[in-house]
């Protein structure tokens, strides 16, 4: 019986250490997040092209200055978010490989922009 208790305690200790390491790794990646401001005004994204480094998590701080709601969407980034008139939204994007990623306002399809990762 004492050997079983020792094994259980050893396993719990390993799980605790692994959990703490996972939490500290998550905190480090949150600090690495690149936040990019993006405004929707008069059915246009400003700027129309935003740049982010490869391999880093991205947060797009989208502010809708328009009089109507906008739907920020990107099929290639797998994100979709309705932003009410006068409101802001924080849109998280996974770390990306170099490329040019299109996004658009699904309510006004001519409104489009690009996230460029050099």
Task: For each feature predicted by the language model, list its residue ranges.
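Cleavable N-terminal signal peptides
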Residues: 15-19, 28
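N-terminal edge beta-strand
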Residues: 32-55
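Beta-strand-rich interaction surfaces with strong enrichment in secreted/lumenal proteins
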Residues: 48-50, 78-82
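Short beta-strand/loop motifs in extracellular/secreted proteins, especially
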Residues: 58, 68-70, 113
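Asparagine-centered strand-capping/turn motif at beta-strand->loop junctions
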Residues: 62-64
């Amino acid at each position: 019986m004492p050997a079983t208790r020792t094994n259980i305690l050893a396993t719990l200790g390993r799980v605790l250490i692994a959990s703490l390491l996972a939490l500290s790794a998550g905190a480090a990646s949150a600090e690495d997040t690149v936040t990019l401001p993006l405004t929707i005004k008069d059915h246009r994204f400003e700027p129309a092209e935003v740049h982010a480094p490869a391999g880093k998590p991205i947060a797009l701080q989208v502010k809708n200055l328009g009089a109507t709601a906008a739907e920020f969407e990107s099929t290639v980034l797998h994100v979709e978010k309705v932003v009410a008139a006068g409101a802001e939204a924080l849109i998280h994007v996974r770390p990306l490989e170099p490329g040019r990623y299109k996004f658009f306002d699904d309510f006004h399809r001519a409104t489009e922009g690009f996230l460029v990762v050099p």
